[in-house]
């Protein structure tokens, strides 16, 4: 409906999207987020604020799928409304690893823009390391050499970065599209000073720390675009010493598809131009593969020429020797050009490169006719141009090289190569002592071959003989003048009008020289003086070498399309101006906040007084923990309060008995409320409501907590532990360190005949800073929760005598509900690696609620949040044989409850039995348990329904309602499995 581009129905579509944005179903809310950009495209100015408020509501959603779609909507609707991001910043960073891959790209860009707009660039980052000093007077420019330069083999330092280029890149990242038009004219005057008020320090900025911490794991994402986006954040915002972490993930992307490889190389090239030492140690990763496309080969050659060092140039040149023999002669020509660039950068190899290039010129010049081999001609031209580039650095030193090139003119047939050599004749005609004496012979040869030359060569001959005539010595002046006059006569009657025009221009310009008899003769007339100055200005000055930055001065944000096409693509937005956004933290009671609180209530939040940052969680199992405010409902498994009253009757007829019809009625009432319609049930009488429902009896099973026996697991058996046996069992106690920890009781028993000394369990990685996606971020930026230890150290057992046993309590925090924790068992100066496997039943905590609250929460978790599984149960059959005369229904209820509470940490809400059942039929018996997931505080409801006879094996239907689908399904399988397992003992 939102895709119908009619303004007439736009208000209706907006109303529907507004309702769907608050729907209990995640898929519906996600569709609402996807519909917002379509509504925005209709240019509904009067509804612009309402659409932006909906974007804010969806950004505060607890589902990663919705947040990813909301980030896309934010990017297209209001990319500069950073107020919406500021209210949810920490939560968005926290949920970032769980968002779908394509949503992560947009969300990373949004968070980066927010941080730059609010806090500015980081003073310790590469972007600002060259701009003066920081507030403490430390010069980042000096520090960069220590952090990023690579050590040479001889102990020296290689060049670390290009100061001018880094300055230009940092400026380009924050300039708008209009400023790009004038950038080429002011490249040489780029300001390198940033206002210190527009910068921040990572040491005192929690927002920057969180962003870098959340994007670091994404450097190893399966999606290449996500890796590039995360690398862009680290490149722009990370401290100098941390920029290196982007290198290996980017190099890993070079193993992907050809298209991805091309995009990655485009971005790596920018990084390498700014800081060549980043990729210098990894030059082998840029060696050419036979399967690479030509564009990829060209970028790899450019990379190798950029990152070559004195220690790696030998290996790189050996590779280049093989590339020159490649059948693709265009690629071979590019290789020759790369050799010239390497020789220009490194002062130690020009001689070696010159010898090789001269040999290549001789080889190619005698290879045959180039008219049908354009590729071979390209190789020869590039070889000559590379030699020219190396000669420019020190022409006098390479006089012999020039002489060899001049002598090879007769054998070189390629027009472009001949034109380049002839150009060098004119430029270096007065160099040294040998070349001036060769000029007469060379110009005679050029005059003799003028008629058969190509147009570009003829033009260069005309320029060269003019330069030679200007710098001619007295002894050769008359001969050279006659040669010049002869060539000018040939040029005046050439078929090409370009040649004729150039000849007339030069003839008029050199008229003063052609009319004089001696080169040193002074012209008296003012006209001749002016002509002499013009000639000197045109032919006597050398051209300034053009900086490569001037030629390639367009830099765009890493990972963007604009960086590939080298112009601002449609939709490209540079980074905002640093510190251009001022966040008003006092504005906490806005209409948007009220709507978000209402949405949170509809989503079933049990703690409405907490802020929106504490409500977020993933729809599937996440490795990040949410919220810094935790609630504990008790330190042990709980059952209904009525069970603690000894005077309470065993069976009660429930006055608020619940039926399927009434549950459906409640669901309909909730739907009517959501649609802002008044339910029309006020006229119905209670008898009408209860006419079709069946009555249920509420069973009180007493206090079963004392009879619960947690299941024990083996950690180390005596055979592997040299007589040391270690078992562990999960406890229902609440950790006194953090609600994220689980209490585990460990039993150490010495089964050997010798004492065992210094027994301890340790986590070797607990003191290391984890830089992976398993590292969690806790809400409200509470620093005490950012580094929650994985294992609380236990008290060491100094000595364990033979056949002695002792218990220890450890507290662990599992990063994932399915992955085991790797620990190390120390004893007798030995180390044994062990795995402590999590029990899903103890990764939840009891959550006390009434039957009405249970049903209300259950009604809000239908569809994809509800899943069930059937299993069998026979523990009550064994109990009935030992407990004669006990009520059968009570025995079944106690057996099921004990089985559940012995394997999980839950709260028993109620036990209901249909009154109409016969004495032998347990069908319809229903037990309800409630809990919350430790890591996310999300409610998890369990309903067990019984079918079958009391004295036979029962069929159980276990149903779970939970928003975290993956966790709920895994726990469902766990419950179904342990319900089938036989009990160790019946009590």
Swiss-Prot record:
Look up the signal peptide feature and give its range: none
A GO cellular-component term linked to this record: membrane coat
Compositionally biased spans, kind Acidic residues: 603-613
Q: What happens when the gene is disrupted?
A: No obvious phenotype except defective lytic vacuoles with altered morphology and accumulation of proteins.
Compositional bias of kind Low complexity: 614-631
Look up the domain of life of the source: Eukaryota
Instruction: Enumerate the residue ranges of region (Disordered).
Output: 586-662
Task: Tell me the protein's name.
Answer: AP3-complex subunit beta-A
| Organism in which the protein naturally occurs | Arabidopsis thaliana (Mouse-ear cress)
